[in-house]
Amino acid sequence: MPTDVEIAQAHTLEPITDIANRAGVPSDALIPYGFTKAKIDINRIASENTGKLVLVTGISPTPAGEGKSTVLIGLSDAMRLRGHNSIVAIREPSLGPVMGIKGGAAGGGYSQIVPMEDINLHFTGDFHAITAANNTLAAMIDNHIHQGNTLGIDVRRITWQRCLDVNDRCLRKVVTGLGGKAHGVPTETGFTITAASEIMAILCLALDLTDLEARLARIVVGQTFSSEPVTVGQLNAQGALAALLRDAVNPNLVQTLGGTPALCHGGPFANIAHGCNSLIATKTALSLGDVVLTEAGFGSDLGAEKFFDIKSRVGDLNVAATVVVATVRSLKYNAGVPKDELTTENLEALASGVVNLERHVENIRAFGIEPIVALNKFASDTDAEINQLKAWAETMSVQLIPVEVWAHGGQGALELADAVAVSMQNQTSHHLYDPELGIEASLLTIAQKIYGAADVELSKQARQDLAYLQENGWDRLPVCISKTQYSFSDDPSQLGRPEGHTLHVRNLLPRIGAGFIVALTGDVMTMPGLPKKPAAENIGVENGEIKGLF
């Protein structure tokens, strides 16, 4: 079987102008970046939101991932094969994980968005623009202090960090400004990965360029010596940051291998941010297509919860149908089966691990939607394992439909497409909690209803953070919980369906520009590291073509 990149490179891409015509993008709104990718000028697209929105999420993954994006893309092609004017709205890959554990991140097999090499490596420069804006702000903060510090910024309480789109553990803790007075004030700080920057979250939640600049101005970068918050607006930096992001705010148009238009824009992580593609891209797609398929990172406990409670709240979105992607191997992994034994038939482990899928189904129902389970088939799956899961689905009164989009593209998801077409007709989603009840109430609701926890425990530092939020009137914002993707608890070793645990919150961080409060739990880090054998070792160039992107 050819690799993902070999499949993508063997495919003849349609001109992006043809894809734009298929999507209904006016010619004067198309900004080509070569022949196979483009940006869309959002000022020239009518904001009608007439399409139906379908959310694709997943179960708790194995470290290799379960093919959620692959199923999303294949399903979009299947919907088009069934006569729907479908459009995909998907996140841009982060370069760090591409070079780290994941390799390519634009789908897989015959269910990909293309040109996959461009999308994975630099694309249209959105991540670079976000990185530049983030680091320009960091430079302006340090320069303000160096030039006299009229705002009285306390260097010990600067919370803004520089960012890069890499996995580099050595940058987690650094000291800047060394070398004497001429080189600035020594400051203990660190780097985040670009996908975890608040500017990434802002870009993905802004309604337009005007809203983007207003959100940038509200970013809190630290505190003064008198414990007052310091904002970007006080530094008068929002205009420069907006200028750097002027083009990045427009969504990117590419295509699937099946010729379905795809808006690929923004890429916040779901375990350390809100995990959804840009609201601008989603709303643009809803104005163009009759069915828009989008995804939220990791499982229902992370990306999907944040989609319903953060993104949908900001954008006034209604989710008409939801698909939960599951795999046999992940269910066995959630029963404690070692990674090197996941391809061996194990009905006992499958029966034990299916409780994880059960919780994810219940989670989606908590938002008012009856989910459909898409079983992403692998060659190692046996008939006995699949039949056992079908029997389980009957006891849960949930549809479970096997799909083979990796091998067959849209043809491998036609049954799923038919089920989604029925499901999306009469469903209305809702939020899980009311932010007006306060941060602690929001945290407890999510912990109990989505994670199966009994209680939430705030550390001493988190209590101090809460008091600071309350003093500044920020304690009625939605919460964005930063948590491991491998467990419903904050302990990645607690697989399956842990119940009655305590969610430990160590920090509450104001992300006022984005419009939410980040609750840090467990040991989640905002700058990943590379694995022992990074995917970068397999990537290269032969005769001008990229090789090794899985």
From Swiss-Prot:
Its EC number is 6.3.4.3. GO terms for molecular function: ATP binding; formate-tetrahydrofolate ligase activity. It is an enzyme of class 6 (ligase). It catalyses: (6S)-5,6,7,8-tetrahydrofolate + formate + ATP = (6R)-10-formyltetrahydrofolate + ADP + phosphate. Pathway: One-carbon metabolism; tetrahydrofolate interconversion. The keyword Transport does not apply. ATP binds at T62, P63, A64, G65, E66, G67, K68, S69. The keyword Lipoprotein does not apply. Keywords: ATP-binding, Ligase, Nucleotide-binding, One-carbon metabolism. GO terms for biological process: tetrahydrofolate interconversion. Belongs to the formate--tetrahydrofolate ligase family. This is Formate--tetrahydrofolate ligase. The gene is fhs.
